[in-house]
Amino acid sequence: MDWRSAFNFSERVLLSIPSKEVLNPLAVSKYNRKFGNGFSTATHFNDDKSAFAITIHHREGKNEKYKIYLFGTDLTQQLKYDFSDQIEEKNYAFENIATSKDLKTLYFMGKAFFKKRRFDAKERKYQYELVKITNAGHSTQKFADEGRFPESLKPILIDNKLISVGFYADRKDNRYNGLAYFEMNSNSLAIQSKKYNPFSKQFMDDKFGREVDAVVKNLIFKDIHITPNKDIVFSAEEYFVTKGEEFDGNGRRIIEKFHYNDIVCAKLSAQGDMKWARNINKTEVTKGDAAYASYSIFGHGEDMFLFINSGENPQKLSNERIMFKQGYSRNPNVFVIKIDEKGNLSHKKLIDDKEVRLPIMVSRPFVDKASDNLLFYAKRGTKKQMVRVNIGVAPSEPSK
């Protein structure tokens, strides 16, 4: 018997668009800022993974087309929208989504890059926009306060209350200065209140010690947790791509290196005031599969638990700071970092190479929130292992 029939798997064509063959149509990163005239697409899941949106930017003859689709995880199409008219003046690089519970409303957050407008030296060539889409049409809200430059914004629906959280910079060069909060009307998208919270001294000490004139850059939104009293805890990661040379038997070739560095975790009150912000020093670089790099995070009540691969022991830095270093190695050590409701940090080694002999895909666990379990997959070649971690008052020893 074929194993797929044993699980009752079936195939269904969701979308079909006439074009030249595209070898890897989902390979375009949602953070890619290059806009060509070819075929590009991106897929975005909502927070509880109950739905996913697909954007498709392509050409039909001489015309550029931009289509947006929303599907439930049962693969039923909930929305189909032609966004083509909006890309005549702007290119959109969407980053995050939120959906209504009935999946009839889609909120898309991202950068809108102006195509023809002229800019002075103090302006950026893009602005953040939130786009609300229903079958009846769309509406847009821009975030463009003078002297404030939002970054990595994320829309969230909390009991039908629409908010957006992220970071902001005082200059256009993406040197982040703090946390941004916007409360919005979920129907009109009008901004009802907003707050800009500068990074705290604690956060800057975490990241830089006593270094002066240091900067926070390249933060990409990662995850969000709503506490029982509706406080907002969100995390982001310092992520960027560099290019380098690699030599092999065929000569020199240019390769891309993907950097997953420091983790930022911050807590805002339900009204948008910052309670704390912490920085966790980390450095990782990979040339390929990101599953073994980065981190995963699990919110439990008022506490946050972060899981990362790291070397045998974190490196000690100045001012009682530590650095978690390159995680993907032949020694699969997994550390758990706990941040409590006051922002206090603690950590311990959760898994070492005596328990699990294969590298763990630490950034892609299966999360069962109903039972407070995380299931991690470990793999090298044809060898595989599974690791289960249970979250209670504190993480227990993993059972395999």
Identify the residue ranges that each predicted region occupies:
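Blade-level signature of beta-propeller repeat domains, shared across WD40, Kelch, NHL, RCC1
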Residues: V367-K400
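Long, internal scaffold/assembly segments composed of regular secondary structure
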Residues: A98-K111, K116-A236
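Short, conserved, GDST-rich strand-edge loop motifs in beta-rich repeat architectures
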Residues: S50-E64, K111-R124, F167-L179, E237-H259, ...
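Beta-propeller blade signature
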Residues: M1-R4, S10, K65-T76, A121-H138, ...
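C-terminal structural cap/anchor segments
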Residues: F247-D248, K267-M323, P332-V334
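Conserved blade-ending motifs and adjacent loop-strand segments that build the rim/top face
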Residues: T140-K154, I191-N218, D273-Y295, R330-F335, ...
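Structural signature of eukaryotic scaffold interfaces centered on beta-propeller domains
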Residues: V28-A51, E95-T105, K154-N160, K172, ...
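Post-signal peptide N-terminal segment of secreted/secretory-pathway proteins
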Residues: M1-K30, K34-H44, I56, K65-K67
